[in-house]
Regions:
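Nucleotide 5′-phosphate-binding alpha/beta core
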Residues: 1-89, 94-112, 116-120, 366-374, ...
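Conserved S/T- and glycine-rich ATP-binding loop of Class I adenylate-forming
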Residues: 30, 90-93, 129, 178, ...
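Conserved AMP-binding/adenylate-forming
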Residues: 205, 214-310
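Short helix-loop-beta connector
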Residues: 123-127
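AMP-binding/adenylate-forming
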Residues: 104-117, 128-187
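Adenylate-forming
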Residues: 185-203, 220-224
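AMP-binding/adenylate-forming catalytic core of the ANL superfamily
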Residues: 178, 289-403, 422
């Protein structure tokens, strides 16, 4: 099913025409309304009127996540606050959230893009969609919710947690589509078996999974265990949320980016130069229609490539291939962005621990876990066991409150964490080894 056949199947020439018109309008809007962009354009000697073709995109400045933090909370908003209808946010390395504002039209656009994505995955108005992404400041839950409602489907707004109850209600309510992280889908399967429910025996037929990296092997495992078709949705809160792109049920080779709203590029992550078509590099996205917080050439840090060959599904919008990595050190744990430096800043505030630590990432029962190993300083190592346990609990509580991620903290003896002559090894990711 194609949700918006006129927009999703328009000729490539028409897409480029729309993109240029909207890019020119975007440049005028941000130059007039966002001081940060006026300065950025002026520093490069560019005026909005200089943008005469899509080839001129390469002359425009990049926008970084740090720019959003530096302008916290509303410095990049391009409209008055009375036009902002919704605020979402994600965490950052400094503790300041990355804030995104949505106007009424932005939310309508989000619903449109998410509906296109669900339809591309194979969902219809006759489906019952269980949304098991988190709701709240995280964009996952409401994004899938908006899309399913716009599609005309029935929505079960489950959010995250209460895993066994989720499986029970999936059975009782007859859910046919599941929206969550891929790791949580496998966790639901295992939890169901513990209470005598095999999801394979339920009406569930389709999964729309995202918010964390996952492999083709994991997709096959999900399809085998749950007995469904597993599709890949992509999005990030800075750009909009889930629904920026989606793999289609027809081919499952890449995710269609809705190019009438998002203008993608692939650049060399080191030089910033635009790479030739088909090259692998960092994905950069310009938001063409966002009103609240429009972004020019936003560097996503996600590594992928673009595929412009025609798709048998009939959609003409470019496909991005599966994300293969990131150009920064951000970790994604159960859909939550976590930087090692965030945890480091918390540890350095705790009396009695040293600055030597490691994050051990593991995967058990298809869920990611983080163990924080941090060395005690010599003076504290002889403390009573009870005192050490209380200190571990305080650190765990601080990480949970600050980052929204549950961790296990283990205080270890001085000099037990290996030192390196070069860059310190802060992260040991055993998830990859365990998935082999």
């Amino acid at each position: 099913m194609i949700f918006n056949i006129d927009k999703e199947t328009m000729p490539r020439e028409k897409i480029r025409e729309i993109q240029l018109s909207r890019l020119q309008d975007l440049c005028r809007r941000v130059y007039a309304n966002v001081p940060f962009y006026r300065r950025s354009f002026d520093e490069k000697g560019i005026k909005p009127s200089d943008v005469q073709s899509l080839d001129d995109l390469k002359f425009l400045p990049f926008t970084l996540k740090q720019d959003m933090r530096n302008n916290y909370p509303y410095g990049l908003f391009a409209v008055p606050m009375e036009m902002i209808q919704r605020i979402h946010a994600s965490s950052g390395t400094t503790g300041k959230a990355t804030v995104v504002g949505y106007t009424k039209r932005d939310i309508e656009t989000w619903a449109e893009c998410a509906a296109r994505s669900l339809a591309a995955a194979g969902a219809t108005a006759n489906d019952i969609v269980q949304v098991s992404y988190g709701y709240g400041l995280f964009t996952g839950g409401l994004g899938a919710h908006y899309g399913a409602e716009r599609l005309g489907a029935t929505v079960i707004p489950m959010s995250g947690g209460s895993t066994k109850r989720q499986v029970q209600l999936m059975r009782d309510f007859g859910a046919t589509v599941l929206c969550c992280t891929p790791s949580y889908a496998l966790h639901l399967h295992d939890a169901g078996l513990e209470i005598g429910i095999n999801i394979k025996d339920l009406p569930l037929r389709l999964g729309v999974f995202g918010a964390e990296p996952w492999t083709e092997e994991m997709r096959r495992e999900i399809e085998d265990k749950l007995g469904i078709t597993a599709t890949n949705i992509y999005g990030l809160s800075e750009i909009m949320g889930p629904g920026v792109s989606q793999s289609c049920a027809k081919e499952q080779h890449g995710m269609h980016i809705w190019e009438d709203h998002f203008l993608p590029e692939i650049i060399d992550p080191v030089s910033g130069e635009i790479l030739p078509e088909g090259s692998t590099g960092e994905l950069v996205i310009t938001t063409l229609t966002k009103q609240g917080i429009p972004l020019v050439r936003y560097r996503t840090r996600d590594i992928t490539s673009l595929n412009y060959t025609p798709c048998s599904c009939g959609r003409t919008h470019v496909r991005m291939n599966r994300i293969t990595g990131r150009s920064d050190d951000m970790l994604i744990i159960r859909g939550v962005n976590v930087f090692p430096s965030q945890i480091e800043s918390l540890l350095l505030e705790v009396q009695g621990v040293s600055p030597h630590y490691q994050l051990i990432l593991t995967r058990e029962n298809n869920l990611d876990y983080v163990e924080v190993q941090v060395e005690l300083d010599g003076a504290m190592f002889s403390d009573a066991i009870k005192d050490l346990q209380q200190r571990e609990q305080r650190i765990q509580k601080g990480i949970k409150e600050f980052l929204g991620v549950t961790t296990k903290v283990r205080l270890v003896e001085p000099h037990s964490i290996p030192r390196s002559e070069g860059k310190a090894v802060r992260v040991i990711d055993r998830r990859v080894m365990q998935s082999r």
